[in-house]
Amino acid sequence: MNKLVARQRLVMTFTFFSMFFGAGNLIFPPFVGAQAGSATIPAAIGFIVSAVGLPILGVLAVTFAGGFDKLASRVSPKFALFLGVAIMLTIGPCFAIPRTATTSFEMMVAPFVPSSYGWLAQLIYSLVFFTLAFLFAQHPEKLSKVLGRFMGPLLLVLIAVLFIACLIHGIGIPANPMGDYSTNQIARGFLDGYQTMDLLAALYFGIVISANIRAQQVDDESQVQKETAYAGLGTGVLLIVIYGALSYVGVVSGAIATIDPTKDTGATVLTNLTSSLFGTFGTAFLGIVFVIACLNVCTGLIGTCATYFHTRFRTVAGRTLSYRTWQVIFTVFSFIVSNAGLSAIIKVSVPVLSALYPIAIVLVLLTLTHKSLGARFPRVYFWTVLLVGIASFATCISSLVAVFGGSIGWLDAALAMLPLQQYQLGWVIPAILGVAIGIADAPRR
């Protein structure tokens, strides 16, 4: 078979879509809409570029390169290992796994518990949640085969119901842009798109799409790339429609109830809306859907991270660590992190993602232009990633210190000298400079 038929392409599109859309993706677009208010359109455009466009380009890049390791090894094999570990820790126990517990807690339990008992309720909930996740992770196929069939459609139905209810309710008077969205809405939306972590996931899991296409007897590599592009285009259209609808939902919610951008999250926006439109039943139903979906995602991530580290680090400090041991480590660590709360996890994850995302972006762009650039000037990978890495990690350190109420004067002053740094895009000029140095470095090799 040289190409897929329409039905197979549709299946690939929904497979692609299911990789990138989960319960966690539901909370960010509404928060963008609630904060941006009357300026939601430019904010949503920025969000869609980074939350939809970049992940799809990432999958294409991994397909063209033949896998994540081959792509990242163009910088160096050690860098490929470092970036792989950083990505797995980010989409695993440091941020994404704990976020599944905190998100579902905020949706299911927090609205019904007095704030004075919130910390105790979260402790008990996260203990039960991660115990179940660990048990399900021993036999993930039993959970995924059942939940995977209906959770995606159920989430889509839920979004449709919320959107239609908002259309019937009417938008009212949109709130004025607030917080970080008071100015530069496109740039802020672009940066908040990092929170989905889908580009990082695309770099590591993107090869799965091309493998599924090859399993349909498509053996010509150029056709595999075309079919991947078709699936990516279809997925992009779906995500744009969904994120646009959810942003509108956020605008309506923001007009109904005022939020505090420094304390509230997208979960707060959704619970405010469902409580207003559907009462207690609506809030409880939304919470149940989130718990089931988040539990399914958490189970898969625990297994994925354990498999990755068991494969690459069979011994640590002279001791052999089994697959089950890695599962225990990641489950316990995620339980501890989750009790910091959703807002705290998001605040800390933003600086970390600001370090990883620019590196991922330039890797993707260099891979997509490999034939005309990287193949002729191999050193562009090294120099571009090096300079972007310096700029983005400096930004990460500065932002992390600021999260905890401190500052590093000389570092902040140095970063302020970078063009576009006011938009958190200070890595762009170093990237261009890295390409130029990489091209100039080629004759000396």
Describe the predicted segments one by one:
Residues V11-F21, A165-G172, Y181-L246, F285-C298, ...:
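Hydrophobic, membrane-embedded alpha-helices of multi-pass small-molecule transporters
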Residues V32, T102-A121, R214-A215, C298-V328:
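Helix-loop-helix connectors at the membrane interface of multi-pass transporters/channels
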Residues G53, L57, L154-C166, T228-A255, ...:
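Selective recognition of specific alpha-helical transmembrane segments in multi-pass small-molecule
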Residues T63-L71, F129-M151, A215-V218, F335-K347, ...:
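Membrane-water interface regions at transmembrane-helix termini and the short interhelical loops
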Residues P93, I97, L156-Y181, L199-L200, ...:
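Hydrophobic alpha-helical segments and their helix-loop junctions in multi-pass secondary transporters
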Residues F136-C166, S349-I361, V380-I390:
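Membrane-interface loop-to-helix entry segments
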Residues H139-F150, I186-G189, I209-L238, I256-T271, ...:
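Hydrophobic, small-residue-rich membrane helices and short re-entrant helix-turn-helix hairpins
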Residues H169, M178, G189, P378-R445:
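A generic transmembrane alpha-helix motif of multi-pass inner-membrane proteins
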